[in-house]
Amino acid sequence: MKEAKIENIDFGSALSERYLAYALSTIMSRSLPDVRDGLKPVHRRLLYAMLQLRLEPNSGYKKCARVVGDVIGKYHPHGDVAVYDTLVRLAQHFSLRYPLIDGQGNFGSIDGDNAAAMRYTESRMTEICTLLMEDIDKDTVDFRSTYDDSDLEPVIMPASFPNLLANGSEGIAVGMATNIPPHNLHELCDALMHLIDHPKAEISDIMNFIKGPDFPTGGIIIDKSDVITSAYMTGRGSFRVRARWEKEELNYGVYQIVVTEIPYQVQKSKLIEQIAILLKDKKIPLVSNIRDESTDIIRLVIEPRDRSCDPQIVMESLFKLTNLESRIQLNMNVIGSNNVPKVMNILEVLQEFLSHRQNIITRRSTYLLNKIKHRLEILEGLRIAYLNLDEIIKIIREEDEPKAIMMQRFQLTEIQVEAILNTRLRSLRKLEEQEIITEHSNLQKQQAILEEILNNPKELWKVVKKEIKAVQAKFGLNTTIGARRTSFEQVTLTNQVVDITAFITKEPITIICSKMGWVRSLKGHNNDLSSIKYKEGDAEKFILEAYTTDKILIISSEGRFFTLLADNISKGKGTGESIKLLVDIGNNDITEILVYKPDHLLLLASSIGKGFVVNSNEVMAQTKSGKQIMNVPDGHTCIACLPVNGDSVACIGESRKLLVFNIDEIPEMKKGQGVTLQKFKNAKLLDIKIFNREDGLSWNSGGKVKLEKNIIAFLGKRGSTGKLPPMGFPKNNRFS
């Protein structure tokens, strides 16, 4: 038994080498497509296996299990689930712009339903798929050994059409990713032919032909042309895609909105669920109901709250809050013809494809030319055999080694003699000189054409262009599959903020929030609140008079702001609902609740003695998680949020020192810790108040309001310590 060999290797070096090997394997052999055929290895192996099984468009279907078995057994030694998922996606008309596989059976749905098991489904190639492998048997591409050296597989596909851009691709590798949306094949062919005629064309010229992505699910791209062009110039960007909808008139002036197309890669079922949740949470008050009436075509019916609602505004609110508008990323990170990953722009991708087609046609022409030369040589031998038929038959019958004798007697090559000897005697007798001459002449014409293609670059590019033109004619705009599905619109309402409060009846309400964070609203103002009940151990903390159309600001002890629509607060005589169900406030306390007023100033203060002024427009939160405005250190809290309605500020803390200074000394900020309001030593700020100096400083003491007009003794600069408060000031060091 041999002794095991142990080497001392630096762990860091070994780890980095192995990780690099893994990363390269992921990038080159799994996640990124090749710019030439737009396929990843698993796609290439799957389609080649189907070609070997002769699953052509005009043949019968075969079980997907058989296809997957061949793929993982011969070419792709990975899990059957991954291969079947790939097969399913290539057959889904809502995933691929030009499906490469024709599936029979349940291949999933746009709702996100899974496909049936592979033992139930069947498949074959589509017509456009055969273009990817056209002429693969004519030495157009290199082959390599499979993983077990038992067979060969193509390194690349001949690809008669630009599959990378036509069908797009997406994948995540180690440290890089790719995301290429699908495009219209007719437009791509126009761009390629223009590039052949004008090799020095720039991206701006190409954009005259390629308008933008063309998604299998349709939709409307609302980006401006300069934004789209910029994305294609850099190879990175994104496209904003909206659902297509129409207004459907009903009786008595009532209407409904019908969505007929949804953005690419948006699952219909999840979209409906998303809208339903917003309806339940009263986030879209302009909508009363949504229902799915889809069959083979998409039909989502949205009912407005009432017929006076502008359908454009209804849809704007839905676009803002749901996936009816989504952003499709563009990241053209692909493996180039030099086997190096690179983010390419649209021009580079098209040039790479044309170079690939140039190489394919060159190799095909060379292959066919060699075949013709071989056949011409044989025909020349057959013509000699025809002219000397009796003598050749005699040699074949009588001589033991007819090959050498025939080569010497008639000056024939070995190939010619082999062809004659391999021809059956009956066939030799039926040889006709005219047939040989006709075939010889035709082959010479073909030979001249092929030699012209190989020797004249202009002729070669003519062939490339002719074949692209043929693809365009077969799958262009005038065909069912080729017509553009995604359109473009300039949306003027994109940046408009939809004021949903305009559709809420304005009614007075009183908002009540308890110490334990239970919130509710009662109709009207000036209510008698003596009969209000709270949970055991709870009591009132905030009482706020507002209107149903108001937006309510909730400030937490950690300095985070939350925004609620007053109409969404629980109504009735119960204990209400926990604030935690409405906003993600966590275990923090509520510092203040205010009615939002546009362009009003608010003063924020923390227990550490710092604060700043902020505009109310800056604190509006758009999400349930809120917006962090005041940064509070550990061990401290945000103690106050006050409307700025005076010229002076009074501060008092645990040190029982009162400081009064001008409010103009506090800067206005958007967020942060703020500046020092009052200096403390081993103490905290407890309370703060804004007032007008000429009115005097007031506070509550023993249920009575006391007023101090003479506050000169307490005046100081912001950041000072302050002085002891006047006699009778509350012992809890608070103004109220």
Curated annotation (Swiss-Prot):
| Cell membrane found in the keyword field | yes
The GO molecular function terms of this record are:
ATP binding; DNA binding; DNA topoisomerase type II (double strand cut, ATP-hydrolyzing) activity
| Class in the EC hierarchy, top level | isomerase
List the catalytic residues: Y120
Q: Where is this site: Transition state stabilizer?
A: R119
GO biological processes: chromosome segregation; DNA topological change
Q: Where in the cell is it found?
A: Cell membrane
**What is this enzyme's catalytic activity, as reactions?**
ATP-dependent breakage, passage and rejoining of double-stranded DNA
The disulfides recorded in the entry are none
Keyword Protease applies: no
Keyword line = Cell membrane, DNA-binding, Isomerase, Membrane, Topoisomerase
Q: Which domain of life is it from?
A: Bacteria
> Which cellular component, as a GO term, is one annotated location?
extrinsic component of plasma membrane
> Which residues are listed under the site Interaction with DNA?
K40, H76, H78
Topology of this chain in the membrane: Peripheral membrane protein
Domain Topo IIA-type catalytic: start-end pairs: 32-496
Pfam families in UniProt: DNA_gyraseA_C, DNA_topoisoIV
On assembly, the entry states: Heterotetramer composed of ParC and ParE.
Query: What HAMAP family does this protein map onto?
Result: ParC_type1
Record's function text: Topoisomerase IV is essential for chromosome segregation. It relaxes supercoiled DNA. Performs the decatenation events required during the replication of a circular DNA molecule.
Q: Which family does it belong to?
A: Belongs to the type II topoisomerase GyrA/ParC subunit family. ParC type 1 subfamily.
Protein name as catalogued: DNA topoisomerase 4 subunit A
Its gene name is parC
